[in-house]
C-alpha cells in the first residue's frame, strides 16, 4: 500500500508548495506555531478551489488544552458546517474530558455533524494527552474516525515509535494511524518501517524573507520573539525529499 503524505499548512503559499512537493492530503490550519487552529472560511474556500488533493480543516477554536466549554463547541459545530460549505473533504478535531478521557458525548455529536455533511474525520493529537491511549483507541473506533493523528504520546513521532507500533496493532485495520510531529526526510522511512503506519504527517517547514521594501523596527504584531519580516512556509523540496526517501 502506498504511503500517504499529509502536509499541514497555514497559508496559501504553503498550499501550492505542498501540492507541488507531492502531498496526498492537506491539513488546513491557522497558526501552526500554536499547534494549528481553525482556518478562516475564506481560507477554506480558496484552498478548496486551488487544491488537487483532499483538504481537511482543523477544528480547534483556541490554543491550549482540549477541554472545551459550550461556546467553544458551538463554534466548532459552525466551523464543521463551514468546511462543508467551503467545499472541503474533511475535518480534524479532538475533545477531552477533564480527566484525560475522550469526551464521547461531545465527540459523538461532532462526528454526527461531520457525517451528515459527508466529511471525513481525523481525530487529532488530543489523543497524545489522553489518560489511556489503549482505551482511546477503542473510543475512536466506536466513533468511526478515519484516522488518528499522533506522535505516539511522545514529543515527536521518532521518539514515539514503540507506542505508534502498538497503536497500529490495536487499531487492527479499523482506522489509520497517522504519524506526525518531527517527521523529516531523514527519519520518515525508519518511522514507517518500525511502526507499520501507512500515513505520515509533516509541515516541511521553512521560512522566506518578507518582500516588503520598508521594514520598520520596534513595532511588533505579536510576540516579541517573532520576526514580522520572516514568513513561515512549506518547502516543496522537503516534501518531495520525504516522498523520494520512502519509496
From Swiss-Prot:
It holds the Pfam family CutC. Keywords: Cytoplasm. It is found in: Cytoplasm. It comes from the Bacteria. The keyword DNA-binding does not apply. GO terms for molecular function: copper ion binding. InterPro entries: CutC-like, CutC-like_dom_sf. The keyword Oxidoreductase does not apply. Disulfide bonds: none annotated. GO terms for cellular component: cytoplasm. Belongs to the CutC family. This is PF03932 family protein CutC. It comes from Aliivibrio salmonicida (strain LFI1238) (Vibrio salmonicida (strain LFI1238)). The gene is cutC.
Amino acid at each position: 500500500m502506498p504511503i500517504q503524505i499529509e502536509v499541514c499548512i497555514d497559508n496559501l503559499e504553503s498550499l501550492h508548495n505542498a501540492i507541488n512537493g507531492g502531498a496526498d492530503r492537506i491539513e488546513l490550519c491557522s497558526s501552526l506555531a500554536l499547534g494549528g487552529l481553525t482556518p478562516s472560511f475564506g481560507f477554506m474556500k480558496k484552498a478548496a478551489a486551488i487544491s488537487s488533493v483532499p483538504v481537511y480543516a482543523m477544528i480547534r477554536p483556541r490554543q491550549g488544552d482540549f477541554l472545551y466549554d459550550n461556546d467553544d463547541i458551538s463554534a466548532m459545530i459552525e466551523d464543521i458546517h463551514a468546511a462543508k460549505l467551503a467545499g472541503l473533504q474533511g475535518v480534524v478535531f479532538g475533545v477531552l474530558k477533564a480527566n484525560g478521557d475522550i469526551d464521547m458525548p461531545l465527540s459523538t455529536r461532532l462526528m454526527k455533524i461531520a457525517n451528515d455533511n459527508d466529511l471525513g474525520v481525523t481525530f487529532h493529537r488530543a489523543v497524545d494527552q489522553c489518560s489511556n491511549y489503549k482505551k482511546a483507541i477503542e473510543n475512536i473506533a466506536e466513533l468511526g474516525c478515519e484516522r488518528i493523528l499522533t506522535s505516539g504520546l511522545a514529543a515527536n513521532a521518532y521518539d514515539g515509535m514503540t507506542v505508534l507500533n502498538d497503536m497500529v496493532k490495536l487499531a487492527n485495520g479499523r482506522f489509520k494511524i497517522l504519524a506526525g510531529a518531527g517527521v523529516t526526510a531523514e527519519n520518515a522511512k525508519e518511522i514507517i518501517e518500525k511502526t507499520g503506519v501507512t500515513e505520515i504527517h509533516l509541515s516541511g517547514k521553512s521560512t522566506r524573507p518578507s518582500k516588503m521594501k520598508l521594514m520598520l523596527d520596534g513595532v511588533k504584531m505579536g510576540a516579541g520573539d517573532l520576526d514580522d519580516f520572516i514568513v513561515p512556509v512549506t518547502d516543496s523540496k522537503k516534501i518531495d525529499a520525504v516522498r523520494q526517501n520512502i519509496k
